[in-house]
Amino acid sequence: MGFSLSNFTGDPFAITTISFGIISWVVALAGAAASEQSTFPHFSWWGVAYQIVIILIIFVLYANNNIELYKFTLVGLVSIAFIYTTNTTNNLIYNSDSSGNLCCAAGCILLSILNLIWILYFGGHPESPTNQFIDSFSIKNHGHEHLGNTNPVSKSEVQAYDEMGANNQDYRRYVSPAQIPDAPQGPLRLGSHQDISSGNGNTTMQPPNMPGSAVHTPQGNTTNNNNTYMSSSHLAGLENFSSQDVPGSGATGRDLTNNSTSNKRNTIYTDSETGTGITFRYKAKALYSYDANPDDINEISFVKDEILEVDDIDGKWWQARRANGQVGICPSNYVKLLDT
């Protein structure tokens, strides 16, 4: 996970608490520096130094987008800082009348409040009401890394598929909103020289090229109307099919025309058929309904109590697959793992 300030700026809770912590620490440091050192508790200097280290650690974890992996460690570290700041406050308020000492005590009071908030948040369960309320402010603004290393499909390219499917019912939309690992790289391009013919002789349409491949006709298969086929390998990573059935044409390819007389089936595929290379090892139940962010093509929508297959369950966003075969990412605090 690379270092990026967008990971930090995308979380309002991180910006608010760390900014508040830096301001409070500066107040405490200024008071300690202005105090008479002969009467100032020397151990309080260690508490002030320890506090800034904790603030910097939390900032780095947020910037690297792996804060979730160290929450329990942070609870212990912040608890120690909480003891230091509260003890320093007690010593400076009741044992000195120096304005510098009182200024340092004021900063330590603010740091104690901050440390208590961090303990409650980092120590709380992701499904707790307080954590879900706090995370709700960053759920839409937090940037996601695209799944895998494929180039993201632009919004205009997806709309081109939608328009083509709306104008010809023989052409189905085979675009997944998520970037699937191991999918061929390269953006989708329109303007293929191959046509998909309809069985009734209607005007053919030119579908977009699949990334890294071309539509072709299997050898030895010739018909009068020059029907074209798409190999099943070209459909790798495109699980997000429409709800309508897809005609099957055997192991060598899938017939995308209306000429096939073979049996139809629902568009739910196994791991080997989809070619994603992902094994969804867990099942999760949706605690709430979630509408995917229209600006992020990787997200999927789901409804409350829906059962999802999930994997890669580290962090705030998990890879998930719905019952209809749609693959993408879902927020971890909206679902609950089921015992299998």
From Swiss-Prot:
PROSITE patterns reported for this sequence: SH3
Against SMART domains, the record matches this protein to: SH3
Q: Which GO terms describe its cellular component?
A: plasma membrane
Entries under SUPFAM superfamilies matching the protein = SH3-domain (SSF50044)
Q: Which residues form the SH3 domain?
A: 279-340
Ranges of the Extracellular topological domain? 34-42, 87-101
> Where in or outside the cell?
Cell membrane
- Biased-composition ranges, Polar residues, are 194-207, 229-246, 255-271
Record key words, sorted: Cell membrane, Membrane, SH3 domain, Stress response, Transmembrane, Transmembrane helix
Its family?
A: Belongs to the SHO1 family.
Q: How does it assemble?
A: Forms homooligomers.
Q: What does this protein do?
A: Plasma membrane osmosensor that activates the high osmolarity glycerol (HOG) MAPK signaling pathway in response to high osmolarity.
Kindly provide the name given to this protein in its UniProt entry.
High osmolarity signaling protein SHO1
At the highest ranks, the source species' classification is: Eukaryota, Fungi, Dikarya, Ascomycota, Saccharomycotina
